[in-house]
Each structure stands twice: as C-alpha cells, then as structure tokens.
C-alpha cells in the first residue's frame, strides 16, 4: 500500500464525528506522503471507516473497482472480517504499512443478472426472498440441469467471504476464501410428503451457473438483496448467478488471516 498514495475515505454513520476524530490521522498520513481526496475517482486506495457494513457500502458505492486497494478501519470494539485496522490504533497500522507488515488479499464476487436487464455484483451475498406472506416458489437450475423446485421463504447465494455472514446464520458452511466457489442456502424451505427440496446448503464451483426461475403465482415481486442493500424491481422472472472474474483487492495484516478472524469471532 506504500505506493498507493491517493486515499479516499468512505464513512458510514456519524460521519462528522468520525471525520473530526480522523483529522490527526489525516495529518500523519499527509506527513508521510499520502494525499487525502474528496472524491474516489482519482483514488488508488479506498478506506472505509465504520464496520463491515460500511466496508460493503464503500465497495458498492465506488463501483467494485479492481484498480484500487480497499481497506477497512473499525470504529467498533474490535476489528472485524473486512476491517483489519482500528480507529484508535491507525498510527500503529501506518507503521505496519511502512514496514511491509501487510498483505493484499483478493476476494471473489458474484455477478447477478436479473431478466437480462439489470446486473450487479455482490461481495457477501445475493438474496431472493418473498415480499408477501406466501410460499415462494422457484425452479432451481444448475447449468442446464433442472435441479429442484424450491418452496419456502427464499434463497441466499453467498461468496466464500460472505459465508460467515447471512449464510452462516442459515447453517451454511464457512468456506475458505481461497476456494473459487459460491454457496446456495435455503430460507425456511417447505419439506413434506408432497414437496421436497435438497434441505441443505450446496456449493458450486467457479465454472457453474445458477439460474433461479420464479413461478408466476402472485409472488413475482420479490425482495432482492445485494449485500446489505435492497433492489427494487417490480416484476422478476429469473435471476442468473455466476462467480465473477471481478475480484476485490483488500489490505490485511499478515498476522490476521481469515481463519484467525473466524476463530476470534465465533469461538
């Protein structure tokens, strides 16, 4: 990151308060040859200040840029999955950066195409959920294979890094982010003598395509989740999901691996 000198800071809640707290850090950065920008266009490093939700917003609002490094500064009690640095210890982090004690990790994203007219990327997960109190019916296809008809509240498709988020609360597997794949998990599936789904999460490799075709039974106005944002589309017939070639480059400490974060968060 030492050669990435043009920084843009993205803030979540309490921006004015956090900017004031970051001013001494700005001075230290400028004294060390960094430039603080007011707009991300010319930045080659984008720093989110907040929590993991802020980091997801920073990536989305700046267009999932592959020519930038992304870094997260936590304002909470401790560092998190996307935030390797803490706002109270940024000066220490700067020393680690100058001593080359950091690594750049590439995180995969998924690409979603809705009805051939709307497409977007997700760093954590894509979710498709019922917007009314009625069973959601979706025909699930893997590549050209009709796999199953899902009935329930919805489906969540997660990346490896997103496997520790919404997916984990659905009893999905935690997946090493070095494995190029994506995972499909169910939301309250309906399983009885008449209707049957796989009943468990399943993982697809990077060459697979997942197609979700909605049955037109009055529930074709779903809630579409893009990480921590909702997309409003009046009518949806199908969504096609693939692992994207687009990867997000993030800055992490050498002594703070993905599995160390998992251990610290859940064990």
Curated annotation (Swiss-Prot):
Its EC number(s): 2.7.1.23
Alphabetic keyword roster: ATP-binding, Cytoplasm, Kinase, NAD, NADP, Nucleotide-binding, Transferase
Record carries keyword Cytoplasm: yes
Reaction it catalyzes: NAD(+) + ATP = ADP + NADP(+) + H(+)
Active site: 52 (proton acceptor)
GO terms assigned for molecular function: ATP binding; metal ion binding; NAD binding; NAD+ kinase activity
Name of the protein: NAD kinase 2
Organism expressing this protein natively: Bacillus anthracis
Gene assigned in the entry: nadK2
């Amino acid at each position: 990151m030492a050669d990435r000198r043009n920084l843009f800071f993205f803030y979540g809640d309490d921006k004015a308060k956090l900017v004031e707290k970051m001013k001494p850090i700005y001075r230290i950065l400028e004294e060390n040859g960094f430039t603080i920008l007011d707009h991300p266009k010319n930045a080659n490093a984008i720093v989110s200040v907040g929590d993991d939700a802020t980091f997801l917003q920073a990536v989305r609002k700046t267009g999932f840029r592959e020519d930038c490094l992304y870094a997260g500064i936590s304002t909470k009690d401790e560092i998190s999955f996307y935030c390797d640095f803490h706002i109270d210890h940024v000066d220490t982090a700067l020393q680690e950066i100058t001593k080359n004690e950091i690594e750049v990790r590439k995180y995969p994203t998924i690409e979603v195409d809705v009805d051939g007219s709307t497409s977007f990327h997700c760093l954590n997960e894509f979710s498709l959920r019922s917007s009314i109190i009625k069973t959601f019916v979706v025909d699930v296809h893997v590549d050209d294979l009709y796999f199953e008809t899902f009935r329930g509240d919805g489906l969540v498709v997660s990346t490896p890094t997103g496997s520790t988020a919404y997916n984990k609360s659905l009893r999905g597997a935690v997946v090493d982010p070095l494995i190029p794949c994506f995972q499909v998990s169910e939301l309250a599936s309906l399983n009885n003598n008449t209707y049957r789904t796989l009943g468990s999460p399943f993982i697809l490799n990077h060459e697979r395509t997942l197609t979700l075709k909605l049955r037109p039974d009055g529930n074709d106005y779903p809630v579409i989740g893009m990480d921590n944002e909702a997309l409003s589309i009046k009518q949806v017939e199908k969504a096609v999901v693939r692992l994207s070639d687009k990867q997000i480059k993030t800055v992490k400490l050498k002594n703070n691996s993905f599995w160390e974060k998992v251990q610290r968060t859940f064990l």
